[in-house]
Amino acid sequence: MTRHSRSATVKLRRGRRSDLDALVALEHALFDSQFFAGHLIARASFRRLLASPGATFLVAEAGKQIGAQIGIQVGAQVGAYVLVLYRANSGAARIYSIGVAARFRRRGLARSLVAAAEKDAVRRGRKAMRLEVRADDRGTIALYESSGYRRIGRAPGYYNGRVDALRLEKVLGKEPRRDL
């Protein structure tokens, strides 16, 4: 999937081993290592997860567009990612981590990555997508709720014993019912 946004072309694709340095740098730039202690993905874990059949990495690769008709990108870089985990014998997938570099925010990348992750989960036979989000992160909560996620619980002190997490879930494969 390719999107054009503010003079940049954004391509969603599966993560590759060659993305390892960019993914590690993005994870550590986005998440405070003291606040998110125990939740940050280490380099070795990224490497293992990129090769794991129980995980899907999707990345948004952004670059300058040249030749609009032929769609060539130059200077492409990983601007965002989502990591989805799949447990055997579970009907649900889990968004474990999602991040968008500051300079690529407000372009719909997170929403596009979540939608692509949901499609992948449906393709793998999952009936629901679950995740945790900081209870004080109103913007991210609004993104998920506007995408059909609902609150199913709260985890006190989930983030380093200091901030609660909300547990969210979306039933996949069905359009939400709209009352007339």
Residue ranges and their predicted role:
Residues 3, 14-105, 111-116, 120-124, ...:
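Acetyl-CoA-dependent GNAT
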Residues 5-7:
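Serine residues within intrinsically disordered or low-complexity segments
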Residues 21, 141-142:
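Alpha-helical elements of the RecA-like P-loop NTPase motor core of helicases
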Residues 57, 127-130, 134-141, 147, ...:
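C-terminal "cap" of GNAT-fold acetyltransferases
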Residues 152-155:
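Beta-hairpin "wing" of winged helix-turn-helix
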